[in-house]
Amino acid sequence: MQQRRPVRRALLSVSDKAGIVEFAQALSARGVELLSTGGTARLLAEKGLPVTEVSDYTGFPEMMDGRVKTLHPKVHGGILGRRGQDDAIMEEHQIQPIDMVVVNLYPFAQTVAREGCSLEDAVENIDIGGPTMVRSAAKNHKDVAIVVKSSDYDAIIKEMDANEGSLTLATRFDLAIKAFEHTAAYDSMIANYFGSMVPAYHGESKEAAGRFPRTLNLNFIKKQDMRYGENSHQQAAFYIEENVKEASVATATQVQGKALSYNNIADTDAALECVKEFAEPACVIVKHANPCGVAIGNSILDAYDRAYKTDPTSAFGGIIAFNRELDAETAQAIISRQFVEVIIAPSASEEALKITAAKQNVRVLTCGQWGERVPGLDFKRVNGGLLVQDRDLGMVGAEELRVVTKRQPTEQELRDALFCWKVAKFVKSNAIVYAKNNMTIGIGAGQMSRVYSAKIAGIKAADEGLEVKGSSMASDAFFPFRDGIDAAAAAGVTCVIQPGGSIRDDEVIAAADEHGIAMLFTDMRHFRH
């Protein structure tokens, strides 16, 4: 099998025209004949490039408002024809070999994301000729190069220059993989969209099925292989969504340290998503996917110092997230005080990076600032299936809370209640969080009974010498019995925030009244499993 194939004729037909003129100029300068369609052909001609319209090449005009352009034997024969095997039949029918196909597809995702997009709009943005050419070229990668990503343009020209106008089989095969990934993702988007429209289409509902089509097709891109998974006997890799719109661990840049582990990524995600809840300078320290210390402060140094005091023992080897730039003073405090696996922040100063560089094992990630949180889906794998739900972006403000006890909370209790409610959302259920003066003072996570989570939170506070008296307590779900309130009162809690909704709410409220505790209902639960 010949490893190299010269590129003498290329067909270019793209929706995303970024870089296409420069790429076409580079091809033409190297003697490549250019074929093109529609808007791409007009653009290239306007730039003075010698380009042949596909309709002139085939002798068949574009028709049906552009629905039929490239679906012709002279196009697909030129792409699919096997060099050295189909030459005679190609010559008989005046089919010229096409050595490169440059295609990206109609912007279906952008179309359906637009407010007010109708099914008819979506249908008109389903590309037919494009995917057909992509698949034809990818199938015949032995002889044809298929280019679907503008990010490959420069590398292709460099390789052609290094190989006297040819591309290697290895490159053509790699391009074919990208092509099939491209069409698979495209078809998945269409299938998901159509699947979500089934009830409305059949008149069963006035609304579409929403985010949950009857068949779910997912496309993720491998970002990196991991040394191992959650445990050393498990293999693992990290896959990310394409075109992620929110600052996240998936989009973060590692600026220092050794490769991230599977557990590093999971814990960093937990820390970053928690710290995003706060507008003030905040710090979140996570261990085994649970916050072990959270605080807001006048600066990130102040926030870190307060978060660390919650549970210094658990903070050892933890993940630290900030919602402001990592500065030198804070970096020095962390490095001097504890062993840390990962620090993530929107940015890091040069001075801070010089300080953390002294500890080679410390991984530093920057993720950029985040704006409004982006709705999406969460997944949980079960044996033989996948649970899918909307991302939990729910949160309540002070105006939405219901005071259900005789005593009203003080202003400070209310602030602390809202603070620890945000933290409880990210603690594994059953979750109890004690907070005072905008810092956690005790966290009880992952217990099978809520009362034991409450007791653990109190024990944590006592172990660190943190005063619970006058603190607020958050519970991620309702109290099924009064025992959790009794445990909180014994520890010194004076305000409780919880969803409510238990059949024993009256009993729980009565317990709070007995202890002089103010209780707030959110009417929103935050289970986390």
From Swiss-Prot:
<comment type="similarity">
    <text>Belongs to the PurH family.</text>
</comment>
<dbReference type="InterPro" id="IPR011607">
    <property type="entry name" value="MGS-like_dom"/>
</dbReference>
<feature type="modified residue" description="N6-acetyllysine">
    <location>
        <position position="287"/>
    </location>
</feature>
<dbReference type="GO" id="GO:0003937">
    <property type="term" value="F:IMP cyclohydrolase activity"/>
</dbReference>
<dbReference type="InterPro" id="IPR002695">
    <property type="entry name" value="PurH-like"/>
</dbReference>
<dbReference type="Pfam" id="PF02142">
    <property type="entry name" value="MGS"/>
</dbReference>
<dbReference type="Pfam" id="PF01808">
    <property type="entry name" value="AICARFT_IMPCHas"/>
</dbReference>
<comment type="pathway">
    <text>Purine metabolism; IMP biosynthesis via de novo pathway; 5-formamido-1-(5-phospho-D-ribosyl)imidazole-4-carboxamide from 5-amino-1-(5-phospho-D-ribosyl)imidazole-4-carboxamide (10-formyl THF route): step 1/1.</text>
</comment>
<dbReference type="GO" id="GO:0004643">
    <property type="term" value="F:phosphoribosylaminoimidazolecarboxamide formyltransferase activity"/>
</dbReference>
<dbReference type="GO" id="GO:0006189">
    <property type="term" value="P:'de novo' IMP biosynthetic process"/>
</dbReference>
<keyword id="KW-0808">Transferase</keyword>
<dbReference type="InterPro" id="IPR016193">
    <property type="entry name" value="Cytidine_deaminase-like"/>
</dbReference>
<keyword id="KW-0511">Multifunctional enzyme</keyword>
<keyword id="KW-0658">Purine biosynthesis</keyword>
<keyword id="KW-0007">Acetylation</keyword>
<feature type="domain" description="MGS-like">
    <location>
        <begin position="1"/>
        <end position="148"/>
    </location>
</feature>
<comment type="pathway">
    <text>Purine metabolism; IMP biosynthesis via de novo pathway; IMP from 5-formamido-1-(5-phospho-D-ribosyl)imidazole-4-carboxamide: step 1/1.</text>
</comment>
<protein>
    <recommendedName>
        <fullName>Bifunctional purine biosynthesis protein PurH</fullName>
        <ecNumber>2.1.2.3</ecNumber>
        <ecNumber>3.5.4.10</ecNumber>
    </recommendedName>
</protein>
<dbReference type="InterPro" id="IPR024051">
    <property type="entry name" value="AICAR_Tfase_dup_dom_sf"/>
</dbReference>
<keyword id="KW-0378">Hydrolase</keyword>
<dbReference type="GO" id="GO:0005829">
    <property type="term" value="C:cytosol"/>
</dbReference>
<dbReference type="InterPro" id="IPR036914">
    <property type="entry name" value="MGS-like_dom_sf"/>
</dbReference>
